Each structure stands twice: as structure tokens, then as C-alpha cells.
């Protein structure tokens, strides 16, 4: 391996993009830069009440360019020449419509302010009805069950549901779209000038988990399936939309002359294939087979890799897909997750902050002090809970505030808070939130184990994992497993850099690169036996409430969700 080689990892999150420079020799994180998306920060093109969340492509382009240029300018000139590759991860499923040149439609003047011409963010749930239609058709018997390898339930968060929703809602976008592309596949194509649909290299991760693609039926389902879903879907889009997909260790191309000039990097820089953030995060964390990796942020994405022989063609039910090569080439990558984790705590903080906002409006001179109080709310609640962590009067909270991803995706579900009394105070209710997120984590673990997919180890990574030991300890107690906290906040970007190093030829395989570059374990939390026993009782109560509450959100004629 060439000494001094550097790989860059690009991590496109919900709020910002991060670029991380990594030493390929030892995995040292040399420098990082984070830039927030300006339009997203202003709340443009989104409507939370309608579950509509869109990203303008300029947010990605401008933030990415600013982040990379800022980081590269801090490098000595000689070091810039040592950058050998760029890897990309992103949220998903986050697709956008593109024209025949591969330009996202919102980059054209006539679509510049049209949310339907933008990237439909992973947590956009406007396509619930369309997801229901896909599931009904998969189970109709008219076709093979194309949901077999994605856990048996197609989600409103995924590729075809979102495309169908926009197709039905917006005739102009429907007629202008030559194809659709996931963000993680579009960025490497953009940087290598290969965005045209016939040039575009689709990633095994995005295609395998979100598009119903599988080798058992030769790729995508047939055109007849989508025509039966809605003839509008195949009226203008070419068919098949694509045929091949590629693992992320393979190069997409090299940096185009235009982007090399804009970023201050050589045209020899290799672009590796893209993948979803949590899949690359698992690689950055050094995950081995049968390690459940929980990437914890606003939501969670849980990743587990398994041997082909153990899976042996079985369909694992209730998860978000099993894809050969979606994480590590040659292994089956399995995805699960919780639709809300950090978002639940943020919601509770906003709820409690209403009087502060009202006071700041009436007394502007107090705004700095009130903002400081608001910023410290969650930490204060956590401290109060840790001082008196009583489980005897813990409220029931169901962690469905943004629907449920796993087990068995159902985005119609809503959060539930129950079992309150006049003695329930804010820290106790916050304790209920902590327990709920831990219970959701255990339900995912059990979903694997009940289908003979063992969970030998549990890793947690992300800001909450490192900064909220009380929440992580609750997870260890509820799951009754040691919980290893990964030593980096940047594992997703690190994983992207690992793939860049492999694609650039510095390693022959992802496992070899992991041995050199993956991060280590910061600490291990052990379950407390006394709390394990009490949480077991509370988990059973949680499951009873889940079983009782879920039927209340079943679709009915004329119902609103």
C-alpha cells in the first residue's frame, strides 16, 4: 500500500453533509468538515404536518462543495495529491427524478420550486397509500410475492412508493422524468460525470433493499407488475428502469475535470460506489458477522451481516431487506431500524419548551437566557432521571412517533403515551421515552433471533451512543446484552472512506481494509441484573400495549392518517 494515501468519505445526512479525510494506512481521522443544508435549515419545501420532507439538490451540491473545498484548503498542496478516492453514503431511500442527461428535475428552471422534482427524503411518509397498494399486489397471487426478500412489507419510505406517489400527484414531473435515482448513487455519478441514465451505476445496497430487485426473478419485477400497480408508472418511464447493480467496493469512475477544478483535487481521484449511511457505518465500525450494529441518530438503522450458508435462501420476515453484498461483498446484509429515536427526545424537548418560546416572544430581552435553558433541557431531564431511575411507576410509551420500521414496517402507526397519574412528572415521563426506545431496540433483536439469525454482539454508534450513557445503559439492560460503544462519531463517513480505498486499489477487499482502517471500541456497558429483571416485566407490558394499540391504526374507509 502506498504510504500516505488518503481517502475521503462523504456522509449525506438529514441535516448536513460531512466530509472526513482518513489515512489509509492506519485509519486515523485526519480532518473533517460539516456543512448544513441552507434550504432545509429554513424549512423550505417541507410540511411536517403532512409528513412531507424534501431536499433540494442544490442543498447537496452547495454543501458538499463547501465542505470539501474547506477541508482541502486546509491540506498542504502535496497532501492534496495523496487523495486517492472518495466514497459516498447517504440517507435512504431518498430518490429523485432525473431527465435524460441525469439532471435532477429541480435543477431545471421550470421545476426549481417544485417539491415533487426534488429528492424525497427517507422520512417522507406521503406515500402510505402507495405502499399499501404495492403490498396488496405482492400478496394478491397475481404475481410472485416480490416483497419476499425485503421482510414481507414494502414501506412508504422506499423507492417505488415515493415514485408512484409523485407520479400520481404531478403530471409535469411524471412526463419529464426519464428515470429516478437514489441520492447515494447520484452523488458519485455527479462527481464522475456519469449521471445520464444509460451511464448511471446503481448500487447493490440501494437497489437490493428498496427497489424489489432480486436475482431470483432476474432483477426488477416485470413491467406487467408495475402496470398492474398503476399504468401511469410505466407510461413515460423506460423499462426496465435499470438492469444491473454493483457493490460499493467497485469504482464508478474518476473525478471529472469540472469537479476536480471546483474541489481542488486531481482527476485521478477514484469514486467508489455509493451505499446507504448505516450500511457503510457498520463497515466503519468494523462489524463482523452476526454483530447487530445500531446506528443511532434521529432514527436508528440496524445492520447485521450473515453467511450465505446460514441464510440458505430463506426469507427473513419483518426486516427491511436481505441483500447479498449490500454491506460487505460476499455476505448477506440485513437491515432493520426504528423510525424514531433521537426524534422522540427532540419532540419531548420541543413540547416542554413552548412556555420558553412564548416568554421569549413577550420578553425579547430574555431570549438568550431562555435559549440556554432550552438547550439544556434534555441533559437536565437525563440527570434527573439518573438520580431517581424508578421503574415502579414508569409510563407506557410506544415508540411509533414516526411509524414503525421494524419489526414489520407500518407507517400508519402513531406514538402512544399511557398509564399516567397525577404523580407523573417530566423526568419520569422522560424515563418512559428512554425505556420505549430501548424496547424498540430489543424487538428488532428478537425479530432476528426468532428466525435463527443469531445476535452474538451489539454495537452502538453515533452521537447519542457516545454522549448519552443513561440511554445506552437502558438499552443494555433491556436487551440483556453487553453493549459496545464505538469510538467514533463519524463511522458512516469512515465506512465510505474504506470503500473509497478499496475502489482505488489500495486494498483487495473490504475486510482487509477494515483491519487497517475501521475504528475501535470506546467502552462496553454491562447489563445490570436487577434492572434486567424489572425491565423484562415492563417489556412484556410494552408488547401487550403494542398488540392492543396497533389495530386502532388499521386503514378504514374514509380514515385520515
From Swiss-Prot:
According to UniProt, the name of this protein is Ribulokinase
Q: Which SUPFAM superfamilies match?
A: Actin-like ATPase domain
EC assignment? 2.7.1.16
InterPro entries registered for this protein in UniProt: ATPase_NBD, Carb_kinase_FGGY, FGGY_C, Ribulokinase
An annotated GO cellular component of this protein is:
cytoplasm
Q: Which residues form a coiled coil?
A: none
Q: Which UniProt keywords apply?
A: Arabinose catabolism, ATP-binding, Carbohydrate metabolism, Kinase, Nucleotide-binding, Transferase
> Pathway it acts in?
Carbohydrate degradation; L-arabinose degradation via L-ribulose; D-xylulose 5-phosphate from L-arabinose (bacterial route): step 2/3
| Reaction(s) catalysed by this chain's protein | D-ribulose + ATP = D-ribulose 5-phosphate + ADP + H(+); L-ribulose + ATP = L-ribulose 5-phosphate + ADP + H(+)
Keyword check for Cytoplasm, yes or no. Answer: no
- Name the domain of life this protein comes from: Bacteria
Q: Does the keyword Nucleotide-binding apply?
A: yes
Concerning Pfam families, the annotation shows: FGGY_C
Give the family, as the similarity comment puts it. Belongs to the ribulokinase family.
Q: Which GO terms describe its biological process?
A: L-arabinose catabolic process to xylulose 5-phosphate
GO molecular function terms listed in the Swiss-Prot or TrEMBL record: ATP binding; D-ribulokinase activity; ribulokinase activity
Amino acid at each position: 500500500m502506498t504510504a500516505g494515501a488518503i481517502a475521503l468519505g462523504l456522509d449525506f445526512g438529514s441535516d448536513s453533509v460531512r466530509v472526513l479525510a482518513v489515512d489509509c494506512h492506519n485509519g486515523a481521522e485526519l480532518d473533517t468538515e460539516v456543512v448544513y443544508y441552507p434550504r432545509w435549515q429554513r424549512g423550505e419545501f417541507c410540511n411536517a404536518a403532512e409528513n412531507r420532507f424534501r431536499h433540494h439538490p442544490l442543498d447537496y451540491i452547495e454543501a458538499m462543495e463547501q465542505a470539501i473545498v474547506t477541508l482541502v484548503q486546509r491540506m498542504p498542496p502535496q497532501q492534496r495529491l495523496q487523495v486517492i478516492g472518495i466514497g459516498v453514503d447517504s440517507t435512504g431511500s431518498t430518490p429523485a427524478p432525473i431527465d435524460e442527461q441525469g439532471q435532477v428535475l429541480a435543477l431545471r428552471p421550470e421545476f426549481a420550486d417544485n417539491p415533487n422534482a426534488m429528492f424525497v427524503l427517507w422520512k417522507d411518509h406521503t406515500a402510505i397509500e402507495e405502499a399499501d397498494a404495492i403490498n396488496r399486489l405482492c400478496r394478491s397471487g397475481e404475481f410472485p410475492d416480490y416483497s419476499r426478500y425485503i421482510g414481507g412489507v414494502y414501506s412508504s419510505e422506499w423507492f417505488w412508493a415515493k415514485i408512484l406517489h409523485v407520479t400520481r400527484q404531478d403530471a409535469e414531473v411524471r412526463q419529464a422524468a426519464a428515470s429516478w435515482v437514489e441520492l447515494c448513487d447520484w452523488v458519485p455519478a455527479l462527481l464522475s460525470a456519469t449521471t445520464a441514465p444509460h451511464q448511471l451505476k446503481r448500487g447493490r445496497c440501494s437497489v437490493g433493499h428498496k427497489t424489489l430487485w432480486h436475482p431470483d426473478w432476474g432483477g426488477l419485477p416485470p413491467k406487467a407488475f408495475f402496470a398492474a400497480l398503476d399504468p401511469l408508472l410505466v407510461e413515460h418511464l423506460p423499462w426496465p428502469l435499470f438492469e444491473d447493480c454493483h457493490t460499493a467496493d467497485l469504482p464508478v469512475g474518476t473525478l471529472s475535470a469540472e469537479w476536480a477544478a471546483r474541489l481542488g483535487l486531481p482527476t485521478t481521484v477514484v469514486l467508489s460506489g455509493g451505499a446507504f449511511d448505516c450500511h457503510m457505518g457498520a463497515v466503519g465500525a468494523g462489524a463482523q458477522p452476526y454483530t447487530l450494529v445500531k446506528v443511532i441518530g434521529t432514527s436508528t438503522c440496524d445492520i447485521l451481516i450473515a453467511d450465505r450458508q446460514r441464510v440458505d435462501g430463506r426469507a427473513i420476515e419483518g426486516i427491511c431487506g436481505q441483500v447479498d453484498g449490500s454491506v460487505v461483498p460476499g455476505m448477506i446484509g440485513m437491515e432493520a431500524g426504528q423510525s424514531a429515536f433521537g426524534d422522540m427526545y427532540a419532540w419531548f424537548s420541543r413540547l416542554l419548551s413552548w412556555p420558553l418560546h412564548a416568554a421569549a416572544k413577550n420578553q425579547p430581552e430574555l431570549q438568550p437566557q431562555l435559549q440556554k435553558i432550552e438547550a439544556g433541557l434534555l441533559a437536565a431531564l437525563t440527570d434527573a432521571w439518573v438520580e431517581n431511575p424508578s421503574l415502579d411507576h414508569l409510563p407506557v410509551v410506544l415508540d411509533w412517533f414516526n411509524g414503525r420500521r421494524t419489526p414489520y414496517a407500518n407507517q400508519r402507526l402513531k406514538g402512544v403515551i399511557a398509564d399516567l397519574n397525577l404523580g407523573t412528572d417530566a423526568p419520569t415521563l422522560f424515563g418512559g421515552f428512554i425505556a420505549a426506545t430501548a424496547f424498540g431496540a430489543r424487538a428488532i433483536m428478537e425479530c432476528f433471533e426468532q428466525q435463527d439469525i443469531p445476535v452474538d454482539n451489539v454495537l452502538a454508534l453515533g452521537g447519542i451512543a457516545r454522549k448519552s450513557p443513561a440511554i445506552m445503559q437502558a438499552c443494555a439492560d433491556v436487551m440483556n446484552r453487553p453493549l459496545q460503544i464505538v469510538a467514533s462519531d463519524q463511522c458512516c463517513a469512515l465506512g465510505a472512506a474504506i470503500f473509497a480505498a478499496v475502489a482505488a486499489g489500495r486494498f483487495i477487499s473490504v475486510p482487509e481494509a477494515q483491519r487497517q482502517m475501521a475504528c475501535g471500541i470506546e467502552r462496553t456497558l454491562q447489563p445490570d441484573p436487577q434492572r434486567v429483571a424489572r425491565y423484562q416485566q415492563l417489556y412484556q407490558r410494552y408488547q401487550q400495549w403494542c398488540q392492543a394499540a396497533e389495530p386502532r391504526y388499521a386503514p378504514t374507509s374514509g380514515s385520515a392518517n
